[in-house]
Amino acid sequence: MTVKTRFAPSPTGYLHIGGVRTALFSWAFARHHKGEFLLRIEDTDLARSTAESVNIILDGMKWVGLDYDNADNVVYQTRRFDRYKEVIAELLAKGDAYYCYCSKEELEAMREKAEKEGTATYDRRWRPEAGKTLPEIPAGVQPVVRFKTPLDGVTKWTDLVKGEISIPNEALDDLIIARADGTPTYNFCAVVDDYDMGVTHIIRGDDHVNNTPKQINILKAIGANLPEYGHLPMILNEQGKKISKRSGDTVAITDFGAMGILPEAMLNYLARLGWAHGDDEFFTTEQFIEWFDLKDVSPSPSRMDLKKLYWINGEHIKITPDGKLTELVKPRLALRDIHETEKPALEDVLALVKDRAQDLNALADECLYFYKKQVPAEADVAKHWDDEAAARMLRFAERLEGLEDWNAKAIHDLFKPFCDEEGIKMGKLGMPLRLAVCGTAKTPSVDAVLALISKEKVLKRIRA
């Protein structure tokens, strides 16, 4: 059997971080088992679904690196209405579905009664049964189509995350599978799609647990083999509440890219939200695919931790090849009015500073002083700069100017003799030198920094 999983987002807005985590686990499961990962766009909500939102989903999937095996044949539900109508007609013909002519007022009264009695919402008054007389069909009413849910027994499955789940059928409504205007409903479309796509494992959020028994019963009615189900726990924000844009949480996957997060780091972090491989916190995408197993997914909600995300991102920055990192940082430097034609070469700068930042924006800022002296912080000036330091910098500039070979070793070899002559420790030279040349007291090894900036620029900055 070829494992087939799917990700089925609705194009009604941004691509939510929770949705991406669901897609990631579904993708990793398929890749681990050498199977197929499929994309389906659930766009039956015609009022809210937009082409722009579809593009946001596709762009988000591309950014985060989740490739899907039906890229040339992505399933769009709005293109499959004829197929849904065909299956509905089959269910009606077999007696597994029926027309319901209830008015909104009747349904509201049933809902209120059901809330008081703790029963299923719909009283099945239009459900055909042997020996039952149905109401007279009202004039001018367009009916909905309901699925004929089994009344006896239970619907149960072994959830790949939550374990055994059993729902009494008497607790289930006769689900509406087609609205009065003829359009099919979500639960029905999803079932037909999963059947036609050959999906073997449905991995999704645990907000779909209540949909599962309804969908299982429909699958049985159309004669389908049942897939296996795994329902993933919710992701909470740092306060332990549901992630919400209204609460100020970052929820759209593209926002994390703007924050300077690498897609590899995002996948690494999302993988750890609910799944574990021993004590491993940092790993590559290839390792994740090799290690992934749904039995290692916790059924309990996980909580966002942005500090950990940034730490993981910093670790991924360190192992990113300098050439690739250059292409990622280059546009961020352009926004800071630093362009690729300027010296020193950005790739050389990044090789020196890449372990000093936890996101690409901070990394771009870390590069700035190689191209333009920055305005030093008042606290650094107060601590490391005075008239004596200024005079000492001018004396050291004379030593630098005398160097024939401009490289880190040659610059480093000047430090000890100069400090001995001045009767100072290295800190009294290094910190003011950083301020004079870079505008900050926090840099990598000062000899390496000066070597990259160039002799001409270093002397000009010191003597400015």
Curated annotation (Swiss-Prot):
Pfam families registered for this protein in UniProt: Anticodon_2 (PF19269), tRNA-synt_1c (PF00749)
Keyword Protein biosynthesis: yes
Full protein name: Glutamate--tRNA ligase
Lineage: Bacteria, Pseudomonadati, Pseudomonadota, Betaproteobacteria, Neisseriales
Record's subunit section: Monomer.
Function recorded in the entry: Catalyzes the attachment of glutamate to tRNA(Glu) in a two-step reaction: glutamate is first activated by ATP to form Glu-AMP and then transferred to the acceptor end of tRNA(Glu).
Motif ('HIGH' region): 9-19
Any Gene Ontology biological process: glutamyl-tRNA aminoacylation
PANTHER family named in the record: GLUTAMATE--TRNA LIGASE, GLUTAMATE--TRNA LIGASE, MITOCHONDRIAL-RELATED
Keywords attached to this entry: Aminoacyl-tRNA synthetase, ATP-binding, Cytoplasm, Ligase, Nucleotide-binding, Protein biosynthesis
Motif extent ('KMSKS' region): 242-246
List of residues binding ATP: 245
